[in-house]
Amino acid sequence: LQDGMLLFGEVGLVGEVRAVSQAERRVTEAIKTGYTVCVLPESNRASIEKAGNLDTQKIKLIGVRHVRELLDCVGL
């Protein structure tokens, strides 16, 4: 992983990346801790951006739907 990158989500049996609870809270804590990139389930990313409660200038949110996309994001 690159420095400052955080990953979270639930991975299903066929590789789908599922939403998790309290995603906005997790991203808020990541910002406070100095993370600059967050790879998370696409549905969580969309919900966070729609709510508009976070300063997305401080962290780049990358939504993924499948492990293949996740691996591309981290360069594997």
Range-by-range predicted roles:
Residues L1-L76:
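Peripheral, non-AAA+ core regions of ATP-driven protein-machinery
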